């Protein structure tokens, strides 16, 4: 069984852009897709480096993250073939019809983006690979 952690962010201030260096990535490689989504809602540029390993997961997650954020209207670039530079877009577009590349982590990111955008949530079946009760958990925390 893989260990699970919980991160709680509290505060009354806006989030600041982050700069995540290569040496931090190996311990958080599976969290990079959701971190990239969070960065897309922060004013300023965030840089996440050392993402080579994302290219060899269930899909090329680096390209998958890039395509999802770009389709949403986020200013995002891949630098040196292994880093993401992410800036909030002026207008964030619909999250409908985004391609998860049949990758469970990208599918969860799309579902989270749909929650943030207030859109209909697409719980793709591929999510069950790593988080079988994701849909049920999300439904318990959503309040109309």
Predicted features along the sequence, with ranges:
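Short, structured segments at the rim of ligand-binding sites
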Residues: 1-144
């Amino acid at each position: 069984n893989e260990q699970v952690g919980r991160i709680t962010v509290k505060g009354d201030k806006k989030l600041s852009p982050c700069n995540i260096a290569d040496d931090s990535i190996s311990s958080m490689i599976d969290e990079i897709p959701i971190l990239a989504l969070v960065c897309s809602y922060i004013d300023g540029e965030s840089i996440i480096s050392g993402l080579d390993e994302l290219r060899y997961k269930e899909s090329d997650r680096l390209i998958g993250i890039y395509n999802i954020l770009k389709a949403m209207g986020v200013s995002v670039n891949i630098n040196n073939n292994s880093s993401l530079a992410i800036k909030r877009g002026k207008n964030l577009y619909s999250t409908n019809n985004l391609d998860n590349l049949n990758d469970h982590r990208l599918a969860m990111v799309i579902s989270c983006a749909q929650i943030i955008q207030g859109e209909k949530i697409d719980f793709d079946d591929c999510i069950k690979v790593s988080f079988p009760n994701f849909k049920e958990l999300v439904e318990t925390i959503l309040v109309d």
